[in-house]
Amino acid sequence: MIRYPNGIKAGIRPSQKALSIDLAPTLLDLAGTAPGNEFHGVSLRPLLEGTSADWRSSFLVEYYSDTVFERIFKMGYKAVRTENYKYIQYVNLENMNELYDLAADPYELRNVIRDSGYADIVTKMQIELQRLLDATS
């Protein structure tokens, strides 16, 4: 939620996905300062002003737990989310990866990773996950 009466109309609700990492670049942009390269987020200002339709098509999610509980510790994962799909790759568990078709299954109840009809999507999501990991490492 951002309130800026001099630059953003009240009630704006962009449909694009915003991330917490976008907050600092947005505030810097609104203050008239360009964010540095150390920021992985992007300014939401164009979306809030209604001037940009070009936006990220995917984003990276990573989770690593502590070592208190061995089973939970082994559940670290890296994931990529697009508008229609979520691909999850577990760090320490083999053959446990997941793919969800969010358009058909918004509650993520059916893992379609082994469904042959999704083989091309799995490959694309794996490539996109690696691209995002390379971009943020």
Regions found by a protein language model. Give the residues of each.
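The feature captures the short pre-catalytic strand/loop hairpin that immediately precedes
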Residues: 1-9
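Intrinsically disordered, low-complexity polar regions and short flexible loop motifs
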Residues: 105
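Glycine-rich "substrate-gating" loop/helix at the edge of Rossmann-like oxidoreductase active sites
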Residues: 13-18
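Phosphate-coordinating loops and pocket residues in cytosolic domains that bind phosphorylated ligands
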Residues: 114
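C-terminal cap/loop subdomain of S1 sulfatases and analogous C-terminal strand-loop tails that border
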Residues: 8-10, 21-24, 29-98, 102, ...
